[in-house]
């Protein structure tokens, strides 16, 4: 075993099987290589050292047959899903990291430098190294049913390291390459459909899935006969490339504030590709060597380990929520009631009817509000139909399931009722008391409260055991987090039903104890509070707002404040200040902002430049103790570390991993920080504040 193979001792090897076939219309044998790790599509083929060597051996066999062409494809539904990342934590030195990059380049470029034409028949998912195999091939076809194509590496903290950064911009142009390598990857890991891949020039042809291989071979025969010559765009290596790199830098700055090394290195490699000549092996050597060096740097970076940790949280822990009771206890939901018909309630109605496909009834204080809520849902369904995502029949069926009533007696046959009204405890208690008069004893009463006590809300009910917190994040259709809060008397059947319903709604549920602010809002308000307190003391708005970009939040604190709404933030802050007065303090500046009914700190001039709203500058009184950006960052980090440890001690969540999951799914915190606790460990903040790390050494770190 080589050093790198030792690191990947547990690799599920993707084998490569060579078959020499006769193809109608092609004179001479064709070598068909199939990538297959021996499992079905739920375990995609990937490349570790073993898989790369298997492909290398398959190419030896193919070339030995003296074919007129070589084609490569994958097992059903999967072409190849990139590098095997399971061995990455075992890579401990730079030589190992360099070896992995060089091995991939050595094997893949055999397709590019082949003296006979090479074809990639992309029959299914092709991501990362999988797509790079296709890019090294001379020609590419894709099945119309291929699930996803893309280069998602920067999303995790890597770069496309087996040719992607050098080949793609020289194939489809630098601007399109920026879209695939950076813009899509950093936009929640967006991928390409086969149709879009064809439009961009990533593939040369798209065929139906039923006879994809046959059509691909027929197309290859026409290429070999000279009847088809795939077009390649002329690449602008001057201003066009300049503009693309400027856009790349803007994307990375906007998404990561340049705090994630992977995307930053990707920009550098895309710039280098300007001078890479795909017809010159020496030029390719230089470009690929730069990829090897970048990959080695990143494989040994804490940010990549944090990214893999975050990826694991989102794809594994989120699917098995800690603290969820046995799912067999969950009751079936066949009808849903929603109290409230405002924007949040209407979004909930849309989600429930779309995902559960059961009757949904809205109620509110007057018919006008109800009609508006039902109309909103119908309008959203019409939009989906207009985009071709729903057939006319399906759209009509969904619209027929949504209704409204002024009378809560209409909820008599519902199994699950959720209130989404103003954050007032007395109002919510009154609503639940009224509902108890009309619904069955086992009907779930859920609350979308963002901070109020579930236990207090249920205290006066005949059946407090069926009350549960079910806190969504806005916009409901976009943010995947759902906090499930157990009140003092919430029973296991109710809790199990809540978790099962969250899964049916395609949301990621995190269980929380019934303490003010629950998980996300408690940390959000603590963070915003530190920034606003710094401004109250005299720190300039611009300094305070930009000081904590390193934390990985997707927007600055005052931009987030405008999105949440100052009044909502103040109300939640007041709830937390009442519960934890030693750590949460109402900002006089925020109170003044709310009193003046101002919606934001920032305003924008005709030139689009962001400035402090003059009225806000006047009403927000400041002291004379200005902090530097470093001081604001330090106090915010320390506040995070302190609050998280207290929450863990209180049992708000089961583990630090759940804190990170909430921040990633509810607030879009960066993968490169693993949420927040890996970052606090990496910067030494955890130990400075709490005397210990949140995560064990080697977890989300080198």
Predicted regions and their residues:
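N-terminal glycine-rich phosphate-binding loop for ADP-containing cofactors
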Residues: 4-12, 16-28, 36, 58, ...
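A short, well-ordered alpha-helical element
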Residues: 45-68
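Conserved catalytic cysteine-centered active-site region
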Residues: 108-120
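STAS-typified acidic loop motif
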Residues: 26-53, 76
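Amphipathic alpha-helical interaction surfaces in cytosolic regulatory modules
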Residues: 55, 60, 76-90, 108-111
């Amino acid at each position: 075993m080589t050093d790198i193979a030792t690191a990947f001792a547990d690799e599920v090897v993707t084998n490569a099987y060579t078959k020499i076939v006769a193809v109608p219309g092609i004179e001479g044998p064709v070598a068909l290589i199939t990538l297959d790790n021996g499992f079905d599509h739920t375990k995609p083929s990937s490349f570790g050292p073993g898989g790369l060597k298997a492909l290398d051996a398959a190419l030896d066999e193919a070339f030995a047959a003296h074919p007129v062409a070589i084609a490569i494809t994958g097992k059903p539904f999967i072409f190849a899903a990139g590098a095997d990342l399971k061995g990455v934590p075992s890579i401990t030195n730079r030589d190992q990291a360099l070896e992995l990059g060089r091995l991939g380049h050595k094997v893949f470029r055999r397709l590019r430098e082949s003296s006979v034409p090479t074809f990639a028949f992309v029959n299914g998912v092709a991501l990362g190294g999988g797509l790079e195999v296709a890019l090294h091939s001379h020609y590419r076809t894709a099945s119309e049913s291929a699930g996803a194509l893309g280069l998602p590496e920067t999303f995790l903290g890597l770069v496309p390291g087996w040719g992607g950064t050098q080949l793609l911009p020289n194939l489809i142009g630098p601007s399109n390459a920026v879209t695939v390598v950076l813009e899509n990857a950093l936009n929640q890991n967006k991928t390409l459909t086969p149709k879009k891949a064809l439009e961009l020039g990533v593939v040369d042809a798209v065929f139906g899935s039923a006879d994809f291989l046959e059509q691909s071979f027929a197309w290859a025969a026409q290429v070999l006969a000279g009847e088809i010559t795939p077009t390649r765009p002329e690449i602008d290596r001057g201003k066009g490339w300049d503009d693309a790199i400027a856009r790349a830098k803007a994307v990375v700055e906007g998404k990561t504030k340049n705090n994630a090394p992977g995307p930053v290195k990707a920009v550098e490699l895309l710039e280098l590709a300007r001078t890479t000549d795909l017809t010159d092996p020496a030029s390719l050597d230089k470009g690929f060597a730069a990829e090897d060096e970048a990959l080695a740097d990143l494989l040994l970076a804490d940010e990549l380990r944090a990214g893999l940790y975050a990826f694991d949280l989102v794809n594994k822990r989120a699917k098995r929520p800690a603290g969820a009771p046995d799912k067999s206890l969950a009751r079936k939901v066949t009808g849903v009631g929603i109290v409230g018909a405002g924007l949040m309630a209407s979004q909930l109605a849309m989600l429930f009817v779309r995902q559960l496909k059961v009757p949904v009834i809205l109620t509110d204080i007057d018919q006008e509000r109800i009609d508006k809520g039902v109309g909103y849902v119908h309008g959203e369904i019409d939009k989906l139909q207009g985009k071709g995502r729903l057939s006319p029949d399906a759209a009509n069926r969904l619209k027929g399931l949504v209704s409204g009533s002024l009378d809560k007696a209409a909820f008599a046959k519902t199994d699950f009722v959720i209130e989404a009204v103003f954050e007032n405890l007395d109002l919510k208690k009154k609503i639940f008391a009224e509902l108890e008069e009309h619904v069955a004893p086992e009907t779930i009463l859920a609350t979308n409260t963002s901070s109020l006590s579930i236990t207090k809300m249920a205290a006066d009910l005949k059946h407090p055991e069926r009350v549960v917190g079910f806190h969504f994040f806005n916009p409901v259709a976009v943010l995947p987090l759902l906090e499930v809060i157990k009140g003092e008397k919430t029973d296991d059947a109710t809790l199990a039903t809540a978790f099962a319903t969250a899964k049916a709604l395609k949301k990621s549920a995190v269980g929380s104890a019934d303490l003010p602010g629950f998980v996300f809002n408690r940390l959000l308000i603590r963070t915003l509070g530190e920034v606003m307190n710094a401004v109250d003391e005299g720190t300039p708005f611009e300094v305070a707002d930009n000081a904590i970009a390193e934390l990985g939040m997707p927007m600055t604190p005052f931009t987030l404040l405008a999105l949440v709404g100052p009044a909502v933030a103040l109300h939640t802050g007041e709830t937390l200040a009442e519960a934890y007065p030693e750590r949460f303090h109402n900002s006089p500046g925020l109170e003044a902002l709310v009193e003046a009914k101002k919606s934001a700190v920032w305003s924008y001039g005709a030139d689009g430049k962001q400035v402090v709203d003059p009225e806000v500058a006047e009403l927000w009184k400041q002291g004379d103790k200005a902090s530097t950006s470093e001081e604001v960052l330090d106090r915010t980090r320390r506040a995070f570390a302190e609050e998280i440890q207290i929450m863990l001690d209180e049992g708000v969540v089961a583990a630090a991993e759940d804190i990170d999951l909430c921040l990633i799914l509810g607030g879009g915190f960066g993968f490169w920080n693993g949420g927040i606790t890996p970052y606090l460990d990496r910067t030494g903040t955890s130990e400075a504040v709490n005397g210990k790390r949140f995560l064990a050494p080697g977890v989300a770190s080198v």
